[in-house]
């Protein structure tokens, strides 16, 4: 059974119906429609925690999708899966690729910052205070850019920047 027919969630069903209508109505190529269909199936599988299936759909969408902006969201979602699986290095690679195609993707900037912050915390636990400071500075840089792009989305990050004295260079 196709993934789109397995959704039990009202919002997922609504999204699927609207997406199907848009695919039929909008003047897009068959390739673009296929890419979107794989992307949509990937999102659905990801929401259900079916990461292997989601990745298969995202990779297929990447093979078909030519638009850089659309590819950025596919790459971002692949990064999310790797983050969920604890594969932070791989996640960073995908977030960076997403940002190359869409520098305004604040959620990718935020997720990169979260990973650097997490690594900074790990460095502290391992007694590597100098390394932790470098990692925290990287996190701060990415959070500042995310906040610049989406000022109301990252309140916790903004508070962390204020509390740690790293708010310089950001108009608030």
Curated annotation (Swiss-Prot):
Its main location: plastid. The gene is ycf3. Belongs to the Ycf3 family. It is a peripheral membrane protein. It comes from the Eukaryota. Essential for the assembly of the photosystem I (PSI) complex. May act as a chaperone-like factor to guide the assembly of the PSI subunits. Keywords: Chloroplast, Membrane, Photosynthesis, Plastid, Repeat, Thylakoid, TPR repeat. It is found in: Plastid, Chloroplast thylakoid membrane. One of its GO terms (cellular component) is thylakoid. TPR repeats lie at residues 35-68, 72-105, 120-153. GO terms for biological process: photosystem I assembly. NCBIfam families: PRK02603.1. The keyword Repeat applies. This is Photosystem I assembly protein Ycf3. The lineage of its organism: Eukaryota, Viridiplantae, Chlorophyta, core chlorophytes, Chlorophyceae.
